[in-house]
């Protein structure tokens, strides 16, 4: 019994923990565990820095292993002992049935039991499929052999998965470090912005203090002068009151003509309630610009004949003289409009347009199917989502145009499209503040839309983080 147990233990130690077969060309790794050379090489195939042991997960630093020739010879001995044991087992396999004392010679498929011929008699196994143990053993041996390769593959895949997962902590550290650096950079820029804004606000406050001090000093001087005038008047009144009737009455006209100075007004201190123009959306907008900025160019084939598109397709302006251009089907012929590239079918995208001092413009997105011969885009906002400057006022066109109140004149407009969310948002880049957001369900391709207006000032697509 002890010999059998020892032999079983030897058989287990002689097998690879990866393929579960006898060790082939055995090698030993840093932690002392043994594997087939090909198995450990496959397990470490995609690793570069840390090489975990498939058994104990010890991190081997350089992925080195050494051949174990002595273990290889022991494996051959273990195989020989296994073969001898198998032959002996075959000789001893003639076992008697405990119930009938007959040789166990048949196998019941339904009950998965080895039986003697008497066991197959009714009623215990009546109607069951029984077959000789030789044929049954061949059948199940083939079945078990068919399990070996799938199990080996499953085990190899599992080892590869474990190896991949073992690299995840390093990936996590790298991701956290990258995000930490991004956050540090964002907060550094934010702090720089706040420092500049603080200096500007404090400088304006100091100027206001100086201005109020000067006005207050002038007001005090005015009251001091007026006080001196009143003292002079008092002296004259006392002096006149002591004169005779004739002298008093003869001095009255002179007195009233010379003493007509009015009292100065009281100066009240007034400080503007100034504050930092830092908007709540600043940090989020900076992330949007950094992550989703997309390069936009103009499509000359859609440009109205009175529009001149620059060679780099980044600038467009209106001219009173019509250009001789091919009559492409998508060219606008009524309003001075041009569309841009690329087409948007999905995703999130940000771009920025410099409008400068133009007196009239409209920008946004539209469907690729927007009619080019119409005088204006659909008023119901079904084909074009845009904001505009017209008649010195900002508006969101639609069935019921909505006025937009901007605290600071917009010289550059940021546009953020979230196709899946069905949102297009507009930002005043002068103060990085949100203007408005349209919500709809987008279907089909969308394109950048530019209404240039009838003045010669250009519209320009910004190529950097902000417009120069």
UniProtKB/Swiss-Prot annotation:
Its main location: cytoplasm. Residues 276-468 form the B30.2/SPRY domain. It comes from the Eukaryota. It is found in: Cytoplasm, Cytoskeleton, Spindle. The keyword Coiled coil applies. CDD domains: Bbox2_TRIM60-like, RING-HC_TRIM60-like_C-IV, SPRY_PRY_TRIM75. Signal peptide: none annotated. GO terms for cellular component: cytoplasm; extracellular space; spindle. A zinc finger (B box-type) spans 92-133. Transmembrane segments: none annotated. Keywords: Coiled coil, Cytoplasm, Cytoskeleton, Metal-binding, Zinc, Zinc-finger. Zn(2+) binds at residues 97, 100, 119, 125. Pfam families: PRY, SPRY, zf-B_box, zf-C3HC4_4. Residues 170-222 form a coiled coil. One of its GO terms (biological process) is regulation of gene expression. GO terms for molecular function: ubiquitin protein ligase activity; zinc ion binding. SMART domains: BBOX, PRY, RING, SPRY. InterPro entries: B30.2/SPRY, B30.2/SPRY_sf, Butyrophylin_SPRY, ConA-like_dom_sf, PRY, SPRY/PRY_TRIM75, SPRY_dom, TRIM/RBCC. A zinc finger (RING-type) spans 16-57. May play a role in female meiosis. Belongs to the TRIM/RBCC family. This is Tripartite motif-containing protein 75.
């Amino acid at each position: 019994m002890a010999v059998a147990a020892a032999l079983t233990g030897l058989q287990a130690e002689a097998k690879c923990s990866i393929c579960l077969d006898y060790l082939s060309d055995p090698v030993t790794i840093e932690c002392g565990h043994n594997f087939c050379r090909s198995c450990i090489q496959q397990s470490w195939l995609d690793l570069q820095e840390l090489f975990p042991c498939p058994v104990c997960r010890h991190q081997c630093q350089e992925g080195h292993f050494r051949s174990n020739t002595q273990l290889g010879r022991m494996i051959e001995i273990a195989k020989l002992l296994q073969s001898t044991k198998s032959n002996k087992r075959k000789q001893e396999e003639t076992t008697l049935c405990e119930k009938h004392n007959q040789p166990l010679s048949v196998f019941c498929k339904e009950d998965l039991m080895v039986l003697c011929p008497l066991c197959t008699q009714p009623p215990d196994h009546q109607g069951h499929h029984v077959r000789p143990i030789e044929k049954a053993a061949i059948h199940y041996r083939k079945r078990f052999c068919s399990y070996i390769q799938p199990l080996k593959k499953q085990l190899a895949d599992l080892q590869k998965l474990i190896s991949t997962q073992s690299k995840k902590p390093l990936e996590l550290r790298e991701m956290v470090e990258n995000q930490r650096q991004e956050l540090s950079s964002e907060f550094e820029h934010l702090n720089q912005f706040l420092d500049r804004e603080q200096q500007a606000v404090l400088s304006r406050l100091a100027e206001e203090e100086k201005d109020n001090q000067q006005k207050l000093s002038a007001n005090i001087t005015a009251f001091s002068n007026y006080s001196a005038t009143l003292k002079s008047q008092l002296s004259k009144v006392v002096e006149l009151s002591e004169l005779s009737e004739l002298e008093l009455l003869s001095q009255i006209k002179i007195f009233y003509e010379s003493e007509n100075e009015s009292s100065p007004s009281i100066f009240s201190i007034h400080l503007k309630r100034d504050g930092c123009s830092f908007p709540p959306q600043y940090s989020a907008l900076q992330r949007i610009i950094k992550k989703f900025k997309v390069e936009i160019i103009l499509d000359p084939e859609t440009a109205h004949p009175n529009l001149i598109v620059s060679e780099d397709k980044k600038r467009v302006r209106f001219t009173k003289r019509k250009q001789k251009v091919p009559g492409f089907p998508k060219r606008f012929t009524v309003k001075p409009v041009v569309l841009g590239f690329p087409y948007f079918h999905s995703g999130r995208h940000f771009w920025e347009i410099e409008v400068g001092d133009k007196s009239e413009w409209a920008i946004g997105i539209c469907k690729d199917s927007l009619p080019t011969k119409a005088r204006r885009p659909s008023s119901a906002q079904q084909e074009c989502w845009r904001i505009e400057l017209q008649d010195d006022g900002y508006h969101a066109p639609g069935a019921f145009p909505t006025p937009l109140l901007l605290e600071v004149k917009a010289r550059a407009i940021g546009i953020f499209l979230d196709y899946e969310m069905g949102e297009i948002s507009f930002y005043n880049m002068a103060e990085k503040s949100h203007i408005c957001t349209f919500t709809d369900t987008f279907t089909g391709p969308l394109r950048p839309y530019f209404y240039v207006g009838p003045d010669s000032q250009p519209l320009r697509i910004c190529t950097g983080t902000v417009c120069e």
